Structures are given as C-alpha cells and as structure tokens.
From Swiss-Prot:
Coarse class of the protein's main subcellular location: virion
Similarity-based family: Belongs to the influenza viruses PB2 family.
Ranges in a coiled coil: none
Gene this protein is translated from: PB2
Organism name: Influenza A virus (strain A/Budgerigar/Hokkaido/1/1977 H4N6)
Function, as annotated: Plays an essential role in transcription initiation and cap-stealing mechanism, in which cellular capped pre-mRNAs are used to generate primers for viral transcription. Recognizes and binds the 7-methylguanosine-containing cap of the target pre-RNA which is subsequently cleaved after 10-13 nucleotides by the viral protein PA. Plays a role in the initiation of the viral genome replication and modulates the activity of the ribonucleoprotein (RNP) complex.
GO CC annotation, single: host cell nucleus
Segments carrying motif Nuclear localization signal: 736-739
SUPFAM superfamilies linked to this entry: PB2 C-terminal domain-like
Domain of life (superkingdom): Viruses
GO molecular function: RNA binding; RNA-directed RNA polymerase activity
UniProt record, GO biological process: 7-methylguanosine mRNA capping; cap snatching; DNA-templated transcription; symbiont-mediated suppression of host gene expression; symbiont-mediated suppression of host mRNA transcription via inhibition of RNA polymerase II activity; viral RNA genome replication
Site (Avian adaptation): E627
Full protein name: Polymerase basic protein 2
Keywords, comma-separated and alphabetical: Cap snatching, Eukaryotic host gene expression shutoff by virus, Eukaryotic host transcription shutoff by virus, Host gene expression shutoff by virus, Host nucleus, Host-virus interaction, Inhibition of host RNA polymerase II by virus, mRNA capping, mRNA processing, Viral transcription, Virion
C-alpha cells in the first residue's frame, strides 16, 4: 500500500509526468529487446501505435490508379510519399472503407463451395437446439476426438495429391491418384471450382479441412462425435453443462457409426462359421457402407472399437497396442508380469485352468461410461480408483477389474457351475466364464470381497458392497474418484497377428482382442450397409435366407447344373447353402440330406428323369452331412415365420411355388427369379452344356460352317462334325457319336472338355 501511495504522489507532480512521456528510450538493452528478430514483441501496442498514424498501411503503387486521392468528404486516402525501404505507397485506413464500398465486385458463386465446411457449420448451429444449463460436477476424461465435421477420410498424403491436382494442376511432378475416393473427389472438385478467383492457398487450406480427419486429445464429458465436439466450448464447463442437439448430421460421424455396426455383425456371424477368419475376410470384402467398400473404409478410418479392430487385424492392418477385456480398454502404464498356467478351485469346487499374470502391474481402464486406475499384484487387487457416470457404470467397472485381477476372493465367490458358451456353442475361456458369471449377478462377489475403513482424501470416497457411497468404509482397495482417467492418448499402431478363431495377439503373444469382447449392442446404421455375402443373409431373418438361397441357385443355374451332374460333392459344400441349414430342424437335417442325395443319384443314373424345378427345390437340403437311411419323404419341413412350413417334394407349396406359364419361381410369395430354360425339356437342356450323344472335339473350327444352335444338332448324321453354340455364347466343335452305348458317360467328359475347349 505504501508503495502505491508513493507512486500516486510521484504521478501527481507534473515533472514526473513530463520525464515519463518526453524522455527518449536510449538504453541499449531495451532497444535490442524490441528491435531484434522479426517477431513482434508487443503486437497490441504496435497495432495501437500504427493505427494512430495517418497512413499505417502500405500498398502496391497500382492502388493510385484504382483509388481516388480523396474521398467524398475530401479526406486524403493515400500519401504521395513512398514507404521507407520499399517502393510501396502509404495508405490511410479510410482507403479500405472506400474500397469496400466502391471497389470492384466479383462473383460470389464459389464462396459456399470453397468455404463449405463453414457454411455447413452455420446451418448446423442455426438448426441446433440449445437446452437448459445444469450446474454439476463434470467428470471429463481426455479422449481422442474428431474436431472437423464433414470430412472425407483420406490420409494426409492422399489429400495432398488431390489438392495439388485440383488447385495446381499444371505443377511439375506426376501425382498418382490411386484410390477410388481420390478420383471421385478430384473430379467433383475440379468441376465445382472452375474459374474460381479465390486465392489458391485459401482453396488448398479449405480443401484440406474437407478431406482429412483432424483429431485432438480433449477433455470430454458427453458426446464424442464431431458435431458435438465443434460446440464443446458451449456445452460443457468445469461445473456446468448445456444440453444441445445438433442441427444436422455429417457423413464422417455416420460412417464411423455404420462401420461399427457392420463390423460387429460380421464378427458375430464369422464366429459361428467353420472357418471364422476366412469368412470374416470374405464378408469384409463383399460389404459396402454407404456405397463405399468396407475394406477401403477400414484402411482409412481410425475408429478404435473391438469389432472394427478385429476386422483391421484380419486385413493385416496395424491397430492400437492397448487390449480389451469386459468392454474396457486396458493400457499397462507400469510394471511387468510373466504368464503361468495354473489350476485353481472355484467356490463351487470346479477346477479352472487360467493363465495367471505374476508380478506387479498398473493399468488404466477406459470404458464408454466409466474409467479406472488399477494396481494389481499376482492374483491380488491392490488398488482400484474408479469414476463413472452413475452407480451402474461404476459397478460394471468394479466387476471387470475384480475379475481381471484374478484375486482369490473373486474365484471363491463363484456359486454354481461355469458353463457359458459363445455363439458357436463353444465354451468360453475361463476368464470370460468368470466375467459372464459375475456380470449376471455380482452380489456374492461384492459381499465376500471384504471392506476396510478409509482415510479422508480429497476428491475420493468409499463404496459399499451394495454400491452406495460412504465416507467411512469401502470395498477393500476400491475408491470412487470425482476425476476421470484419461484415455490412452498415443496414436501409435502396432503389427498384430490373428488366428483362425479371430483372436488378435501382439508380437509378444499377448491377446489384445477376441470375439468375446465384441459388444452385443444392436443399433440402426445411419448409412445403408449392403452385405453381398451369403453369410449375412440371415441378418434379416429366416425368410430372407430362404429367398436368397433360391435366388442364388437360379442366378447361377448354368454352373450349378453342370456341377450337379459332374461334381455334386463340391456343389453340396458351397458356403451359399450354409445359412439354409439353420432353417432345417436339427433332427431331420441328416435324414433329409441322405434322402435328397439318393434321389439325385437316381436322376443322374436314369436317363430322362432330370427335373430342373425339383433339383432347384431340394438342392439346399442336400448340403447337410447325410445320414444313410431308407426313409422316404413326401414333404420337407423348414422353420420360417416362427413355425414349421412344408416344402412338397413333388409339387408346389406356399414356400416354393413354380409357375409353368410364367416360368417364374416365388418363395414365400416373394419373386425369386425366372428359369431361362424350359424344365420340361429336362434331358435336352436347351442351354445345357451337357451334350449327350456328342463328343466335344475342341475349340470352334471355321471349316465346319457357322455355329448351330443345340436344337439344330439333332439333324446331324452319326460321325458328322459341326460347330455349336452353347450356354454363355461360347462356340465349340462337336461330333455326333457313332454308337449310343456310351451316352451316359458323355455328360461327365463333356464338361471337362468344355472347360478346356472354352479356356
């Protein structure tokens, strides 16, 4: 106070004021400080000082022709004196006003196109709804979030090539645009930005915003999709939150959301297939999301979710080194352990063989609704600090941590037998057995864990076995914190391997992911997901399986027919018949298959009994492993629409109805396609590649005249040769057999020769 009073006295004397305002600054250190380097040391002061001058702006000399010397009020707009050290003109701020009012105008058509992301943001905010403000403690955790709504997902390198091609097309150096998305975007942008007068650097900068995903590691307490992150500063503070509903969605958020749903569906489906890994790859390669190939999205999209990462691992892509257990992402922050197989007894005296982690380790656990720090030793939980949105979320985290710690208390709390199975009816591994057991009911676990008195630590409270908070007691080693645990920030990706059961391991052999970790949550995808793979037919229910199976047979009838007569085993093993098996009552599968295969063999053996419609109808039943039995069936049952429906072996039924007049097949009333050949001419098989009574000699030979249709062949004399047009427009040379005895074997050799002749 004394000093301030003294200074006030000093300032009241006029001499002091004069010294401070008039004296020149000639101390070398001060001059040096403010004049060395290009960096402005006091920008605010500099701006004030410059703007106080009459002509603070310099401009190119051409300005003298474009702007009058004085404005309407007679104020001078520019000075004739040159700027010291350059040949530019000194200009008044009034010149800027004049230029804005009277200067040349330009077309604004390109502005919404170039500044698209800004225009869209304004629209989203205009249509968004801001709700009430709530004051409460915010548990924020840092997460890697997308801060740039409405972008494509190109890599920085791909985007750079696109930008160069669009903005500077004549620059040296050939830019190779490879991906489909690159080519599409380049074409679209070139058309949009024709005759654009906006500075190329600005266009390039704005294009980058549109093409590349930008992520930041930010504290978030609510939604993490980019349309929420762009208003983060409006929706959450340290002790308040404002409700907000975005006024529009952006494609990048929709892609992320739909990718997760597609990946989960595919992993779930692959798990129950005979070869999960190859099935998963087949599905990823044949699926499209919003019209873009799923494999292209997986290569570019950095979304980290269990199912998505399993798909990436299968494609040989790198993924994050953290691992997943019980839906939480674990990252070891210190310590180390060795794994040892050990047999332990549960509270129910069941023996479990588990891989015990020996040693002290610390982990961070991050889930959607709760986070935690876990310190553990060999089969012992030392400390767990957990924070979450609500009681339920905190309980979930505690259960996962207790199971993961392999603590003796947890093992002893098991009541009843552990026999959980996965979708493919295989027993889960012991750790997941334990997890499922306690997720179903954790009462005994919490009751048996033990409680301890707690010290009063700022920001921490205890939690009792019934999950209520307490300031005196807590579950042994467990505390609830107000602060969240940050997500693992590194974007480092590691090389991983995947086995045929979709277990993903790092290079040290630690399991990072397995199908058990894939969430069962069902959602509705924002973008259309098109699964072309037969394995996904069942996603829309049993009816869709039935219709799709028969549609597939009809679409591929030409090749199916040849295989049916030549190589039935290969045909029966086709994966397209796999989904159908789930519709056939389990007890009947083998019997039906044996019956149908026998029937088909009789058709092959006895000339003239080839019945197209019947083969199509019964073929899917022959795919199951056959049981030898003498049983005959007049109808076969399939489970659709929640009950057993009959397919008649001979004749039509509501399930399978062939209309001879229109040659169209309807399955459960849905059109399944048309048969191109007339089933009545079964043995002739107008389009058939099986030419009975003829020998295929090889490729077309022009000396034998123009190609005949199969019908014209009957006019040939024995031993005569002719070119003939078969199935898919291929022409081959044939000879009519001299004797009829070997007709039966023709069909076998015909197809083999056909293949050779055509290829």
């Amino acid at each position: 106070m004394e000093r301030i009073k003294g200074l006030r006295d000093l300032m009241s004397q006029s001499r002091t004021r004069e010294i401070l305002t008039k004296t020149t600054v000639d101390h070398m250190a001060i001059i040096k400080k403010y004049t060395s380097g290009r960096q402005e040391k006091n920008p605010a002061l500099r701006m004030k000082w410059m703007m106080a001058m009459k002509y603070p702006i310099t401009a190119d000399k051409r300005i003298m022709e474009m702007i009058p010397e004085r404005n309407e009020q007679g104020q001078t707009l520019w000075s004739k004196t040159n700027d010291a050290g350059s040949d530019r003109v000194m200009v008044s701020p009034l010149a800027v006003t004049w230029w804005n009012r009277n200067g040349p105008t330009t077309s604004t058509i390109h502005y919404p196109k170039v500044y698209k992301t800004y225009f869209e943001k304004v629209e989203r905010l205009r249509h968004g709804t801001f709700g009430p403000v709530h004051f409460r403690n915010q548990v924020k955790i840092r997460r890697r979030v997308d801060i740039n709504p409405g972008h494509a997902d190109l890599s920085a390198k791909e985007a750079q090539d696109v930008i160069m091609e669009v903005v500077f097309p004549n620059e040296v150096g050939a830019k190779i645009l490879t991906s489909e998305s690159q080519l599409t975007i380049t074409k679209e942008k070139k058309e949009e930005l024709q005759d654009c007068k906006i500075a190329p650097l600005m266009v390039a900068y704005m294009l980058e915003r549109e093409l590349v995903r930008k992520t930041r590691f930010l504290p978030v307490a609510g939604g993490t999709s980019s349309v929420y992150i762009e208003v983060l500063h409006l929706t959450q503070g340290t002790c308040w939150e404002q409700m907000y509903t975005p006024g529009g969605e952006v494609r990048n958020d929709d892609v992320d959301q739909s990718l997760i749903i597609a990946a989960r569906n595919i992993v779930r489906r692959a798990t129950v297939s005979t070869d999960p890994l190859s099935s998963l790859l087949e599905m990823c390669h044949s699926t499209q999301i919003g019209g873009v190939r799923m494999v292209d999205i997986l290569r570019q999209n950095p979304t980290e979710e269990q199912a998505v990462d399993i798909c990436k691992a299968a494609m040989g892509l790198r993924i994050s080194s953290s691992f997943s257990f019980g839906g939480f992402t674990f990252k070891r922050t210190s310590g180390s352990s060795v794994k040892r197989e050990e047999e332990i007894l549960t509270g129910n005296l069941q023996t479990l063989k588990i891989r015990v982690h020996e040693g002290y380790e610390e982990f961070t656990m991050v889930g959607r609704r709760a986070t935690a720090i876990l310190r553990k030793a060999t089969r012992r939980l030392i400390q767990l600090i957990v924070s979450g949105r609500d009681e339920q979320s905190i309980a979930e985290a505690i259960i996962v941590a207790m199971v993961f710690s392999q603590d003796d208390c947890m093992i002893k709390a098991v009541r009843g037998d552990l026999n959980f199975v996965n979708r493919a009816n295989q027993r889960l591994n012991p750790m997941h057995q334990l997890l499922r057991h306690f997720q179903k009911d954790a009462k005994v676990l919490f009751q048996n864990w033990g409680i301890e008195p707690i010290d009063n630590v700022m920001g921490m409270i205890g939690i009792l076995p019934d999950m209520t908070p307490s300031t005196e007691m807590s579950l042994r080693g467990v505390r609830v914190s107000k602060m969240g645990v940050d997500e693992y920030s590194s974007t480092e990706r590691v090389v991983v391997s995947i086995d045929r059961f979709l277990r993903v391991r790092d290079q040290r052999g630690n399991v990072l992911l397995s199908p058990e970790e894939v969430s069962e949550t069902q959602g509705t995808e924002k973008l259309t997901i098109t699964y072309s793979s037969s394995m996904m037919w069942e996603i829309n229910g049993s009816e869709s399986v039935l219709v799709n199976t028969y549609q597939w047979i009809i679409r591929n009838w030409e090749t199916v027919k040849i295989q049916w007569s030549q190589d039935p085993t290969m045909l029966y093993n086709k994966m397209e018949f796999e989904p159908f098996q789930s519709l056939v009552p389990k007890a009947a599968r083998g019997k039906y298959s044996g019956f149908v295969r026998t029937l088909f063999q009789q058709m092959r053996d006895v000339l003239g009994t080839f019945d197209t419609v019947q083969i199509i109808k019964l073929l899917p039943f022959a795919a199951a492993p056959p049981e030898q039995s003498r049983m005959q069936f007049s109808s076969l049952t399939v489970n659709v629409r929640g009950s057993g429906m009959r397919i008649l072996v001979r004749g039509n039924s509501p399930v399978f109805n062939y209309n001879k007049a229109t040659k169209r097949l309807t399955v459960l009333g849905k059109d399944a396609g048309a048969l191109t050949e007339d089933p009545d001419e079964g043995t002739a098989g107008v389009e058939s590649a099986v030419l009975r009574g003829f020998l295929i000699l090889g490729k077309e030979d022009k000396r034998y005249g123009p190609a005949l249709s199969i019908n014209e062949l009957s006019n040939l004399a024995k031993g005569e040769k002719a070119n003939v047009l078969i199935g898919q427009g291929d022409v081959v040379l044939v000879m009519k057999r001299k004797r009829d005895s070997s007709i039966l074997t023709d069909s076998q050799t015909a197809t083999k020769r056909l293949r050779m002749a055509i290829n």
